[in-house]
Amino acid sequence: MEENSKKDHRALLNQGEEDELEVFGYRDHNVRKAFCLVASVLTCGGLLLVFYWRPQWRVWANCIPCPLQEADTVLLRTTDEFQRYMRKKVFCLYLSTLKFPVSKKWEESLVADRHSVINQALIKPELKLRCMEVQKIRYVWNDLEKRFQKVGLLEDSNSCSDIHQTFGLGLTSEEQEVRRLVCGPNAIEVEIQPIWKLLVKQVLNPFYVFQAFTLTLWLSQGYIEYSVAIIILTVISIVLSVYDLRQQSVKLHNLVEDHNKVQVTIIVKDKGLEELESRLLVPGDILILPGKFSLPCDAVLIDGSCVVNEGMLTGESIPVTKTPLPQMENTMPWKCHSLEDYRKHVLFCGTEVIQVKPSGQGPVRAVVLQTGYNTAKGDLVRSILYPRPLNFKLYSDAFKFIVFLACLGVMGFFYALGVYMYHGVPPKDTVTMALILLTVTVPPVLPAALTIGNVYAQKRLKKKKIFCISPQRINMCGQINLVCFDKTGTLTEDGLDLWGTVPTADNCFQEAHSFASGQAVPWSPLCAAMASCHSLILLNGTIQGDPLDLKMFEGTAWKMEDCIVDSCKFGTSVSNIIKPGPKASKSPVEAIITLCQFPFSSSLQRMSVIAQLAGENHFHVYMKGAPEMVARFCRSETVPKNFPQELRSYTVQGFRVIALAHKTLKMGNLSEVEHLAREKVESELTFLGLLIMENRLKKETKLVLKELSEARIRTVMITGDNLQTAITVAKNSEMIPPGSQVIIVEADEPEEFVPASVTWQLVENQETGPGKKEIYMHTGNSSTPRGEGGSCYHFAMSGKSYQVIFQHFNSLLPKILVNGTVFARMSPGQKSSLIEEFQKLNYYVGMCGDGANDCGALKAAHAGISLSEQEASVASPFTSKTTNIQCVPHLIREGRAALVSSFGVFKYLTMYGIIQFISALLLYWQLQLFGNYQYLMQDVAITLMVCLTMSSTHAYPKLAPYRPAGQLLSPPLLLSIFLNSCFSCIVQISAFLYVKQQPWYCEVYQYSECFLANQSNFSTNVSLERNWTGNATLIPGSILSFETTTLWPITTINYITVAFIFSKGKPFRKPIYTNYIFSFLLLAALGLTIFILFSDFQVIYRGMELIPTITSWRVLILVVALTQFCVAFFVEDSILQNHELWLLIKREFGFYSKSQYRTWQKKLAEDSTWPPINRTDYSGDGKNGFYINGGYESHEQIPKRKLKLGGQPTEQHFWARL
């Protein structure tokens, strides 16, 4: 019973998705609430502040655990490594509030969809639903399944038939009202938060609360000037933060506001058409699509087709054709039926419909799938409102440092209590002085130190047309050691040039037709396929669409006409009408009419159309796509026997190859054709030939890849193109260096009696180029020893092989990835999966792509860079308006500079706190302190200015062959802080003790007598000193002393010293002297300090609360400070920052990197049987118990999650939908 109670107390929300949460049920407890109220009053609101910072404590203090079905409060916890908590209240919706009677009979469904969550969640006879809202999404409690479920969307369990039949005629008015109440409005409302609320949120930040406590303490002790300076800076910081947040809020509000005000037309069951505001739409409504139209929801197309621009979501400005969901008589969920191609049926919220094409049976119709924040645009806005925190070691290390400094402060607190109590100081003053020492160790600007470098880096990136929507990732860019590139449009030019066609006849390839002659393709079925099999549209008299389709169409010299003009002539509702142009080859065909289109998809690697030649009664099917894929759908007798060799002869030269196929449909009825399934259309085709296109490297590609290679940054190609083409491009770009071996990894799925297999195939002839062909060795079940150069090898594989290895040879995957360079024919889901696998090997991964099919991978990478002409693409954290890969080294350079700057500022502020802590400990021993203006100069004139300008040093123009340290807790950094702390401690203690040994030294309160007694030992400016020292008693005795006079210039120069030595330039930043403002400030601070030290002006000494000393003592102070500078600089520059020395130490003591990829590289380097060459290995999951190659199975590898072979893609978030 108790176990069931515990089980009912907890459930998972969004199980298996990226935003998965644990939910715990709680019930308010009046006695506990009363105790918390009393405690809040007694602590003057302090407890409420703690509850604000820790919502889980509030729930635990005020509530008692209970089953979720009885809970009135829920506690939510993220399942990621951050374990963040949220508190939400459960509320009830009562259907009795509706204007019409609602059925109270148990057997009657509330909505037409009997499997709807609404039906299952309804509590009868009260007719209520228990709900909660989490990050703008509404959930209802499903008592049958004992969990909260989303509302505001149609269930994925609906089949194609369900969507057409259940929702095809629209919803009744009553069902619409029920859904509106339960699902909420179809609105993406971003509140413009009032300024007072933003101010309160900023002020209640723990950092500002600590700062307020510190400033209150300092003001109470008369530190007016410094406190006022900090208050002014804090107010400016808060105002700027509030202004920035307010502006972001306004921009986001304006971005989504128009979405909520669209007028739409829907079909209401038994009533017909009805116009209403888009915020009243509910899942299941039938939406009528007019011409140009901005979509206010996600909807699935059920009748007609349309062309949409999805640039707002993906950064891809190419129009995308959407086709209706087929009517299939099966119970399979519609997304599973359509596989990854389901996106071709879905219209996403926020995209623009630019053209509609009715089917001839009425207007273009779509069923509303998701509304409000459940939509694609809603997901995007939520990702901005609730960004996922970054798991970067730097930030966790920084927190540990702050905790360490706070512990020092606590030790200082008890030290001060002991000293002041020992001297008999009143308790009030004792506690006050102890608290002051507590605040010394944690500088108020410390939390902001890690972001200052990012601000400067972001500005410099913007000048280079690289825009950033996630500044926290800039530091991560400094750690990148592997960059993945898409091929087409990234490494190679966007545009493809036509090289020629290779037609087939009688099962043989014919002579190639070259486009270099300027002649169009002669009329043939191949020409008809090139003219009709594409997704081009005519928009405002201009043909628009995919660049490949445009080039192919231009090669025919045919033209496209507006379908509306000629639709009557051909007697049918058509998509496109294509006619021969003036320069086209002579054709017996007057026109080609495309009637139906099965769009291209990355996962399917093909597209096809159903067309009709003018004057004919039957129809034709034309297909184009990846040659290997198209050949699979053709009759074997029509595919030339030398097809693989012919294909390879072009792909090894870097050509892009497209295959075309055709068949005739013996049907005379258009309605029969329109309802044909894609599987039936795309079968038994005749192979027509190959279309050869050139895809040239961008001129910047080779230079950038060389620069990354010299910086020892791995480069990998992830593309949807042919494997041979990808390998050739990798070689031509020198991603695969000359002389390296290429091993193709080809894996096959298990069959009935044969287990999964993986074949290792060596590409023999490495010298390739135009006119040269590669030779492949015979593959057998034997191992071939490595030849010369075997230590430099690169694996290449296709997406299909990657998927098989992922499932059946998982232990092989890391071994392949550490040397994998080319991954071809990869689907969007596989690209994201590959990025995640690289990250599991502890690589810091960058991804550069065009932002369309790569959006999932761009989001998954540590630094995703989208090449887009838009200023900021939401497909990735970084967007480059310069559409070549030069942005990659720029970003890495700035990331390294920002990371080093953050470390430098952090080290400086840590040393600042320690130096001040040491001097405070020494002075507290004699109940003394530095004066207000002494602190003011150190804290404002030096420290604050250093923090603001230290990070503005530009990045070094050349990438170093190693990365900066990525951890604050690394040995060089810890040693740097430790040794500098020791230097400071030794110098300060020595000076503190040595000044007491001087013959002219005396206690502060004896100063005047002391001066007269030791007059002969002072400097010659006796008369000047005598004129003002008599008033020394006006200065508080706890400040004016020889100890403060000695320690202040030493510590001040020490601050300048650590600021200088922590501002190292090369190899990651330019030299310090190039940072003019910072250099000037350091020199000015040093000059001012020396001037004050040696000046004999009464106004200066009175103002700075110093005692004049003999010149030799001042010279000694300066010599000591400069000696400390020299020692600290030598240690920092020649030892701690000496990369070669640390490598030598690591080798001598046997220290190795703990990164997984380093471990695997070391293991494989010692394995004489790796890499396997020209052999086949089998998995152990076959029925006949095949041999497993034990050399490649590692028990150290943790089994990873499996890819779904026939199901949905691995991403569960918004990007998977795109």
UniProtKB/Swiss-Prot annotation:
GO BP annotation list: intracellular calcium ion homeostasis; monoatomic ion transmembrane transport; polyamine transmembrane transport
GO terms for MF: ATP binding; ATP hydrolysis activity; ATPase-coupled monoatomic cation transmembrane transporter activity; metal ion binding; P-type ion transporter activity; polyamine transmembrane transporter activity
InterPro entries: ATPase_P-typ_cation-transptr_N, ATPase_P-typ_cyto_dom_N, ATPase_P-typ_P_site, ATPase_P-typ_TM_dom_sf, ATPase_P-typ_transduc_dom_A_sf, HAD-like_sf, HAD_sf, P-type_TPase_V
Transmembrane regions listed in the UniProt entry: 33-53, 222-242, 401-421, 433-453, 903-923, 940-956, 973-993, 1042-1062, 1077-1097, 1115-1135
Subcellular location: Membrane
Superkingdom to which the source organism belongs: Eukaryota
Catalysed reaction, written as an equation: ATP + H2O = ADP + phosphate + H(+)
Residues with glycosylation annotation: 540, 669, 819
EC number: 7.2.2.-
Keywords per UniProt: ATP-binding, Glycoprotein, Magnesium, Membrane, Metal-binding, Nucleotide-binding, Translocase, Transmembrane, Transmembrane helix
Family annotation (PROSITE patterns): ATPASE_E1_E2
Topology in membrane: Multi-pass membrane protein
Predominant cellular place of this UniProt entry's protein: membrane
EC class (word): translocase
Binding site residues for Mg(2+): 850, 854
Entry keyword Nucleotide-binding: yes
Active-site feature positions: 486 (4-aspartylphosphate intermediate)
CDD domains: P-type_ATPase_cation
Annotated GO CC locations: late endosome membrane; plasma membrane
Recorded family membership: Belongs to the cation transport ATPase (P-type) (TC 3.A.3) family. Type V subfamily.
NCBIfam families cross-referenced by the UniProt entry: ATPase_P-type (TIGR01494), P-ATPase-V (TIGR01657)
UniProt-recorded name of the protein: Probable cation-transporting ATPase 13A5
Gene: ATP13A5
